Structures are given as C-alpha cells and as structure tokens.
A protein has these predicted regions:
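Hydrophobic N-terminal alpha-helices or hydrophobic patches in metabolic proteins across all domains
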Residues: 2-236
Length: 236
C-alpha cells in the first residue's frame, strides 16, 4: 500500500527549537535596528543636541527624554507578533524619508529648529519602517507615531490658551457679581490687578494629557473609536 505523499508527518516544534528559530530572526533584527539607530544619531546629531537643550531647559518638554525609549519598549512588547509577521524591507518609506532629509537640511541651513526637530523624529520611525517593511510596521504603528511626541512643539498655543483662560476667569467673576475691568490679559477687581500669565495657560497640562491619554488609550482600549474619544476627553 502506497503512502500518501501529501500527509504531514512533521512533529510540532519543541519550545527550545521554537525559541531557537525566534532568536535567528530576532538577533539579526536587533543588530540591524541598532546600526540604523546609530546612523540616525550621527546624521541628526545637530537636531538631537538642540532638542535635548530644549527638553532640559523647558519644563513643558521634560517628557521628551522618555518618548523614544518608551516607544522602543512598546515595540518590545509586540515582539511576538513581529516574529510571526513577514519582515521585508520596503522602499515605500522613501516617500517620507526623502522629504524629511530635505526638511532637515533646510532646518540646518536656516537655523530653523522646528524643521530640524520635526525631521529628526520623522526620520527615525520612517527608517524603522524601511527596515521592517509595511506589513510589520503596521503591527507597531502606534509606537512609531508615538515618537513624534518628542518634537518640542506647543508653545505656540500659549497666547491662545491665555486668552481662553482670561475669558473663562472673566465669565466666572461676572457670575459672582464682582465688578471688574479687563485690558488684554490683565483683569482688575477691587482687590487688585491680576495678569493671566503663561503658567496659567495650561499648555503643560494640555501636552501631558495628550501624551499620557494617547498612551493609556493604546494600552487599555481596543476600538479605534474608543481610543480617539478617550484622547479627546483627556484634553478637556
């Protein structure tokens, strides 16, 4: 009697064998990512030096030190899914990499820090996308996007948030019946004259809520709608 050649007689892999296969994929990937990270640091050195200066000197952006390490930890949490996903380098990422390089060069030439910082933290996730490929990058899409929180942006909102805070203060004072006079960001009442300062704008709270709210939603909620709703509520 002839044995059916299509019959699968292979035995399931032992845990040690499976771990060995995973290491064959994981170890080269770690080395490649480390090399890519080193090249990124070398190319974006000037942008990194200036952004660290802002992180250190402005308490609004102190969180910047933790964003990239946190993003890599989130990627580490997805390692099992990554190992079961085809990893194939993708040139599609060049549609982001090339403009980012040009933006970085323009930022250096014109000493425009915002351009340098935006390009720096757009290049890193884009290079990882190029290394892993589109399919694998979808598995870690949030950690890659999370890296953009490293960009120290938000101070531009301070004047607008100061106006909102002043409007809110005036509205509350009117409800109490206290006589007042407002001139720009200054509010005068019988007890004295007060300024709605930058610290009253709430920009630190706004940025922190955005970062923490996004992270919490990613880790604890599954639906895209729920995640978006939670982040929006956290900003209020």
């Amino acid at each position: 009697m002839k044995e059916d050649s299509n019959t699968d007689t292979s035995l399931p892999l032992s845990p040690k064998h499976e771990e060995g296969l995973n290491n064959k994929v994981l170890i080269p990937l770690v080395w490649q990512t480390s090399l890519l990270f080193l090249l990124w640091v070398m190319f974006c050195w000037q942008g990194l030096v200036t952004v660290v200066d802002i992180w250190w000197g402005n308490e609004i952006f102190n969180h910047g030190f933790f964003i990239v390490p946190g993003a890599f930890y989130l990627i580490y949490l997805q390692r099992k899914r990554l190992l079961t996903t085809p990893i194939k380098p993708s040139l599609l990422s060049l549609i982001v990499i090339i403009p980012s390089v040009f933006l970085y060069v323009i930022g250096i030439a014109g000493d425009i820090r915002l351009f340098m910082h935006l390009a720096t933290f757009t290049l890193l996730p884009s290079l990882i996308w190029m290394l892993l490929g589109t399919q694998a990058s979808r598995v870690i899409l949030f950690p890659l996007c999370f890296m953009l929180f490293s960009v120290p942006v938000g101070e531009q909102l301070i004047p607008y948030l100061q106006e909102i805070a002043a409007d809110g203060s005036v509205a509350l004072l009117k409800l109490t019946g206290i006589p007042l006079y407002r001139s720009g960001l200054y509010i005068e009442i019988p007890q004295g004259r007060f300024l709605v300062a930058e610290a009253c704008s709430g920009v630190s709270f706004f940025i922190a809520s955005f970062v923490i709210g996004s992270l919490y939603a990613y880790l604890n909620l599954n639906s895209a709608t729920r995640r978006t709703s939670f982040v929006l509520i956290s900003l209020i």
